[in-house]
Amino acid sequence: MAAQGFLLIASFLLLLFLLARPLGNVLARMINGVPLPLVGGVENGVWRVLGIQNQEMNWRQYLLAILLLNVFGLFVLFAMLMLQGILPLNPQQLPGLSWHLALNTAVSFVSNTNWQSYAGETTLSYFSQMVGLTVQNFLSAASGIAVIFALTRAFARQKVNTLGNAWVDLTRITLWVLLPISLVIALFFIQQGTLQNLLPYASYTSLEGVKQMLPMGPVASQEAIKMLGTNGGGFFNANSSHPFENPTALTNFVQMLAIFLIPAALCFAFGDVVNDRRQGRTLLWAMSLIFVVCAALVMWAEWHGNAHFMQLGVDSNINMEGKESRFGILASSLYAVVTTAASCGAVNAMHDSFTALGGMIPLWLMQIGEVVFGGVGSGLYGMLLFVLLAVFIAGLMIGRTPEYLGKKIDVREMKLTALAILVTPALVLMGTALALMTDAGRSGIFNPGIHGFSEVLYAVSSAANNNGSAFAGLSANSPFWNCLLAFCMFVGRFGVIVPVMAIAGSLVSKNIQPTSSGTLPTHGALFVGLLIGTVLLVGALTFIPALALGPVAEHLSLR
C-alpha cells in the first residue's frame, strides 16, 4: 500500500507541476496586462459589444463590479430555477423548484460552492443545467481568479490606487483560460465515455424485469468546468462516482489534475508578477506539504478497515464501503483530499462512509479555509491572508514592523486580515450550534449521536468554506437547512472577498521598501515552516473542540 500510495501521489504532483508551470506564464501575462498573441482583435470586439471601457479601477470600483456581476447572476438563476417548468429543453417535464431550494441552489452556484440539496437527474432540466448552472460555473470561477489578479497587482505595484479593470479581467479569464481548457477536457471526457446529448431519458428493463429510466444529458460540457473551476456540482446525484460522469480510472485522474491546475498555476504566476519566483514556490511548497501529509493519512485510515465491520466479526481488512471498485481505496482517498483541499466538493466516493479519521481529514481541510491549493483564486488569496498573519507574528517576535514583498503591514491590513480569516470559522461554529439548538435543524438529522453531529458540522463547514461536498445523512432540502446553508455560502464567499479587496486597495498605494539585513526572508524552508505552523495553529485553536466532539470521539468509541 505504501509504495502504491507514494507512486500515486508523486505522479499526480509531478504531472500537476509540469502542466501548471506554462499555464502560470499565461496567467502572469494576463495579470501584467501583456496581450496574448493574436487575440487583441477578438477582445476589442467583445468589449465593444458589451460596452466595456478598458480603464483602470480602484479597489472599490473593482469590488463593485465583481459584486454586481454575482448578484445579477444570483437573481437570474433564481428566476430560471423557479420558472423551469415553462422553459425549453425540459424533455422530462420537470417542474420549477420551491423558493427555498431555488434560493439555495442559486447562491450555491454563484458562490462557487455547488452544494446540492437535490438530485440533478430528477430535479433539473437540461436548460437549467446548461444555461443556469454551467454559466455560473464559469462566472464564479472567473470572479475568484479576478480577485487574486487584483491582490497580486497590489503587491507588485506601488504608489498608485488602481488594480486593473474587473470587466477586462473577467473577459480574458473566461475567453482565454476557462473556455479553451474546458473544451479540451470535455472532448477527452466524451472520448472516454462521458455522456453528451440532449436526448430524453431512455427506458429499459432491468435483469429483474423492472422498467426503469436511464438518465441522459449534456454531462461532459458541465463536467469539464465543474472540475477546472473547482465548482464540484454534479450533473447526477452520485456526482463523480456515477459512470456517466466519471467512467474510467483515467478520467478520474484527469479530474483531480483539473481541480488543482489553476490554483497551482496561480502560485507560479504570483512569483512571476512580483519578480521573485521564490515567493510563488514557497506558497506551493507549503500547500504541497500539507496536502501530501493529509493524503497519506486518509489512505492509511481507509486501508486499515472499518471498525464497525470488525466489531461484527466481518472480514474488513480495507474499508471499501461507499467506494467504487473501479477506483479503489487509494484513488478514492486521494480524490477526497484533492476535492476538499480545493473548494471543489466533487466526490467519487461517499465521504460519510469513510472511517472516523479518514473523514476527519477532509473536514479539517475545509475548516482551515480551503487554503491548500484551494479554489481557483480563493485558495491563493486565502493562503496570502495566512502569509500576512505569519509575517505579523514573526514581526512581533523580532520586534520589527512586519513586511511582505517590501510592503509594510500596518494596523489596517491586520484588522482586515483577521476579519477575513475569522468569517468562516464564525459561520461554521455558530451555524452548527444553531442547527443543533433548533427543532428544525435537528429534524433533518437521520443519524443521531456522535456521527450525526459530524454530519451537521461537515455540512455547515462545507457551505461556509464554499466546498459543497457532504457527509450525507441530512435531510437538507427543507426551508431551515436551505436558508441556513445559503446564508453561510453567501457570507463565506463575499464576506472574505470584501476585506481581501480592501487589503489590496491599501497595499497598492504603498511604496516598496528595499530589502535590508533586518528583513524577514519570506522564502525558503524556514518561512514554509512558519506559514504551515500558522495555518495549523489557527485551525487547531478554532476547531479542535468541535472535532473532538465529532470524528475524534467517534474514533475513540470504536476502539
From Swiss-Prot:
Part of the high-affinity ATP-driven potassium transport (or Kdp) system, which catalyzes the hydrolysis of ATP coupled with the electrogenic transport of potassium into the cytoplasm. This subunit binds the periplasmic potassium ions and delivers the ions to the membrane domain of KdpB through an intramembrane tunnel. It holds the Pfam family KdpA. It is a multi-pass membrane protein. One of its GO terms (cellular component) is plasma membrane. It is found in: Cell inner membrane. It comes from Enterobacter sp. (strain 638). The system is composed of three essential subunits: KdpA, KdpB and KdpC. The keyword Protein biosynthesis does not apply. GO terms for molecular function: P-type potassium transmembrane transporter activity; potassium ion binding. The keyword Transmembrane helix applies. This is Potassium-transporting ATPase potassium-binding subunit. Belongs to the KdpA family. Keywords: Cell inner membrane, Cell membrane, Ion transport, Membrane, Potassium, Potassium transport, Transmembrane, Transmembrane helix, Transport. The chain crosses the membrane at residues 6-26, 63-83, 131-151, 173-193, 253-273, 283-303, 327-347, 356-376, 379-399, 416-436, 484-504, 524-544. InterPro entries: KdpA (IPR004623).
